[in-house]
Curated annotation (Swiss-Prot):
It comes from Pyrobaculum calidifontis (strain DSM 21063 / JCM 11548 / VA1). The modification N6-acetyllysine is found at K11. SUPFAM superfamilies: AlbA-like. It comes from the Archaea. Its main location: cytoplasm. Acetylated. Acetylation at Lys-11 decreases DNA-binding affinity. The keyword DNA-binding applies. GO terms for biological process: chromosome condensation. This is DNA/RNA-binding protein Alba.
Length: 92
């Protein structure tokens, strides 16, 4: 069985990502990595805090946070730099 799962946070409601994270931990996954870019960064942070404080209090820790920048092709083929984040959650 896998010990790590990655969840890409995007345009869906925050509760969808919270439920996916909690289900992963309940399935025996020990580490979940939330990845987000641009406007979805705040949704990833909210997801991590909700899982840690409301859904699995005392069972999950925020182990690491990485701030990154990705280069993506924008409109007209121009290259843009977009902020990104990776939040690592682990069972305590």
């Amino acid at each position: 069985m896998a010990t790590e799962q990655t969840i890409l946070v995007g345009k869906k409601p925050t509760t969808n990502y919270v439920i996916a994270t909690v289900m992963a931990f309940n399935a025996g996954i020990k580490r979940v990595v939330l990845k987000a870019r641009g406007a979805a960064i705040s949704k990833a942070v909210s997801t991590a805090v909700m899982v840690r404080d409301r859904f699995l209090p005392g069972k999950v820790q925020i182990r690491d946070v990485k701030l990154l920048s990705d280069k993506v092709q924008g409109q007209g083929g121009r290259e843009r730099t977009v902020a990104a984040v990776e939040i690592v959650l682990e069972m305590a």
